[in-house]
Amino acid sequence: MSGGVDSSVAAMLLKEQGYDVIGVTMQIWQDEEEAVKEANGGCCGLSAVDDARRVAERLEIPYYVMNFKKEFKCHVMDYFVDEYLRGHTPNPCIACNRYVKWESLLQRSLEIGADYIATGHYARIDRLPNGRFAIRNSVTAAKDQTYALYNLTQDQLSHTLMPVGEYTKDEIRALAEEAGLPVAHKPDSQEICFVPDNDYASFIDREAGEKVPGPGNFVTEDGRILGHHKGITHYTLGQRRGLELPMGERVFVTAIRPETNEVVIGSNQELFTDKVLCENVNYMAVENITEPVRVLAKIRYNHKGEYGTLTRQQDGRVLCTFDVPVRAATPGQAMVFYQGEHVLGGGTIVL
């Protein structure tokens, strides 16, 4: 229970369906100062604990706060920093889902006798004719969260319930209001929970210290120096704002080269490609692919997706050849493949 309306209604729905429900909030803040900073925001700060506890009291279910500080620091915060130092743009929510919310929380839940964990994600889970579990799109495309769940394993899915996926956001709020839940109109959290001010570069500076590369050069693809940048952790592929380059035309970040501490600048057209390669592939609806497969692929969370052909490479990586070029496929982000409403799988973009 994050203290938000979605997980609160998920708990309520499951209780109504006859489940024995126990509310749990994950403690992930690293120290009291950080917890105070997050007191008015974030999904697992002090205010979230207060809200979740009030909901649990209203629903008359047991409620606990479980400490996952170590797991969160290792699998999410350190990963986030390391990826930026490599010139990548990570998605920490995907790492948190796989390694903290599911791997760690599920293991601890099973150890104390639970059969499932349940969340307030806008997604559904199906058992397919081939016997495998797969995430299915929620009924509301605007809130669909299947992209961030592609990395879950078969065992994790077999012990997971997602009751909110059958409803729209307005319906969830209406159910919460009807039940008198105190979080019925609580705003959705928009930022990364451990960077509540959205200042990624300052967070990385604090966490990585001397490992953070300093200022370097803006360059063209062929190496011509255009100016000086503040440090590669300030930039991501496709970025236009904040470059402060007097070019006389709109220019964008087209690549980041951590090995030379350079940020490559180019035109918007240079950001488009019809081929995207990914690694660390997790298959969900199928065990593997051996032949080319037609899919709808999304290259970022809010991407509507484009159709393409998926081909498995000899080294296990997967190449998607898109029918229409996609813009700013960013190393470190996930590419998630869909067949119909189901997640076929996904991986981390490398090229």
Indicate where each model-derived feature is located.
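AMP-forming adenylation/ATP pyrophosphatase catalytic core
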Residues: 118-351
